[in-house]
């Protein structure tokens, strides 16, 4: 699963996401993309599940790019632990996804197959998504 190799600070405050994506909102590498229609955090496990679903569908043809990276730590205290004694340990890593973010890109396959693969990936994610083709975003 994806996670940072090294971070300046191990733990971070939660924070909130708002607004639309200013960066990462255009298809840069592939012909097809999966764009977020909502704002949310996506875990490294969800990204990996979506990647596996796509690559299994397209088999050997084509190439997949993951355009989001989980670099925000999510901490959690163990179950049945009393409050206090400091902040919990890092449980998993999240990727911030804003409205309009291109999360995955694909090329080297026909459009129908790409759409099916992206649909499978979309079902693994906690946000509503839209399949886009590079010619649509010009």
From Swiss-Prot:
One of its GO terms (biological process) is translation. Pfam families: Ribosomal_L16. Residues 1-21 are annotated as: Disordered. Residues 1-15 have a biased composition (Basic residues). GO terms for cellular component: cytosolic large ribosomal subunit. InterPro entries: Ribosomal_uL16 (IPR047873), Ribosomal_uL16_bact-type (IPR000114), Ribosomal_uL16_CS (IPR020798), Ribosomal_uL16_dom (IPR016180), Ribosomal_uL16_sf (IPR036920). One of its GO terms (molecular function) is rRNA binding. Keywords: Ribonucleoprotein, Ribosomal protein, RNA-binding, rRNA-binding, tRNA-binding. Belongs to the universal ribosomal protein uL16 family. Binds 23S rRNA and is also seen to make contacts with the A and possibly P site tRNAs. Part of the 50S ribosomal subunit. This is Large ribosomal subunit protein uL16. It comes from Borreliella burgdorferi (strain ATCC 35210 / DSM 4680 / CIP 102532 / B31) (Borrelia burgdorferi). The lineage of its organism: Bacteria, Pseudomonadati, Spirochaetota, Spirochaetia, Spirochaetales.
